[in-house]
Amino acid sequence: MNFSESERLQQLSNEYILGGVNSPSRSYKAVGGGAPVVMKEGHGAYLYDVDGNKFIDYLQAYGPIIAGHAHPHITKAIQEQAAKGVLFGTPTELEIEFSKKLRDAIPSLEKIRFVNSGTEAVMTTIRVARAYTKRNKIIKFAGSYHGHSDLVLVAAGSGPSQLGSPDSAGVPESVAREVITVPFNDINAYKEAIEFWGDEIAAVLVEPIVGNFGMVMPQPGFLEEVNEISHNNGTLVIYDEVITAFRFHYGAAQDLLGVIPDLTAFGKIVGGGLPIGGYGGRQDIMEQVAPLGPAYQAGTMAGNPLSMKAGIALLEVLEQDGVYEKLDSLGQQLEEGLLKLIEKHNITATINRIYGSLTLYFTDEKVTHYDQVEHSDGEAFGKFFKLMLNQGINLAPSKFEAWFLTTEHTEEDIQQTLKAADYAFSQMK
């Protein structure tokens, strides 16, 4: 494929935009470098770049575009609302309608607040949990990404009794001292952390199904034990469902798994492609938030009518019969086809699939925790990524990310993707 115009625009972008991108995940640094492809438009399962190349898109903006690009129903809703006004600074009926649809789908959201991003949503749930428990420390799991606020950009210590260290320049050591990081799916490490820190722990922050070092399921009983241990300690359980809400079924992962948290953060999919975040949970906990309680949270754009209208339209698409069955079926076809090709070409790789989302890891063991992904073959992934890109398959440029299917992908797209993977694997021997 010819990418000359993307390369020209990336050089121009570097003059004005720091690093040439507005999020580091969009650079190709993790796959050997090079100019990122500059996209011009998207329709359904496809993206089109500035050089006129067409791509089958599995990046899907890192997850939000589950109904495909420029879905007619969502696009129409956005256009209609834009003509009426995009921001009022007052309550709107759309906020009420959207909140009701969300609570109907996710019953644990007894009370809801909207914000503008997943980062904001998680950041605020932590503040609310601290206000409710009157404690300061939190526990998070290694490898899970919860946004870029200071408190969650913390790397693991050497063990469950050790405090974390900043995972980014600009995060104070004093902040990192409030965070304990333990391995996902290691209930003994979690018990040890709770036993050691006891009544200092305000909350544990959990991705019920991990989406930030690929797609990783909790081990049987893990989430149930986390809930029990936490509640026995007076610690709140916060689920980060920014990736998982409405990903696998019409609702949240918590309902699919049958394990209910105290608070939930959500975002991505529910905005229909527009900026959004939100959080909610038990009424007695949520009443800590202003204007009813002492924990402050506000936002000029929070609950704006454009995002509310897009979110309502998106849920109207997802609540139709057969949507998630189709995603699961296509995901199964893609997984089975890739596994056959891995065997055919004797590639060291494995796949985690959860319904219509999957991750291809270049490692020889089934992935259940972060260290396995950290030590997987990033060089092999980088080669695979570029071989696929040059055949019109758009993936996330990182070995840690997932492939996302949409309502608009077809069986023909899967077959074309497998044909591209067949060639890519053949060039990696």
Swiss-Prot record:
What reaction does this catalyse?
(S)-4-amino-5-oxopentanoate = 5-aminolevulinate
Alphabetized PROSITE patterns for the sequence:
AA_TRANSFER_CLASS_3 (PS00600)
Per the UniProt record, which EC number(s) apply here?
A: 5.4.3.8
Where this protein primarily resides, as one coarse class?
cytoplasm
The EC class name is isomerase
Q: Which GO terms describe its biological process?
A: protoporphyrinogen IX biosynthetic process
Keywords attached to this entry: Cytoplasm, Isomerase, Porphyrin biosynthesis, Pyridoxal phosphate
Q: Which GO terms describe its molecular function?
A: glutamate-1-semialdehyde 2,1-aminomutase activity; pyridoxal phosphate binding; transaminase activity
Family annotation (CDD domains): OAT_like
Cofactor(s) listed: pyridoxal 5'-phosphate
Q: In which pathway does it act?
A: Porphyrin-containing compound metabolism; protoporphyrin-IX biosynthesis; 5-aminolevulinate from L-glutamyl-tRNA(Glu): step 2/2
What are the N6-(pyridoxal phosphate)lysine sites (modified residues) in this protein?
A: K268
According to the UniProt record, one GO cellular component term is: cytoplasm
Q: Where in the cell is it found?
A: Cytoplasm
| Subunit and partners | Homodimer.
Q: Which family does it belong to?
A: Belongs to the class-III pyridoxal-phosphate-dependent aminotransferase family. HemL subfamily.
NCBIfam families recorded = hemL, PRK00062.1, PRK12389.1
The protein's name is: Glutamate-1-semialdehyde 2,1-aminomutase 2
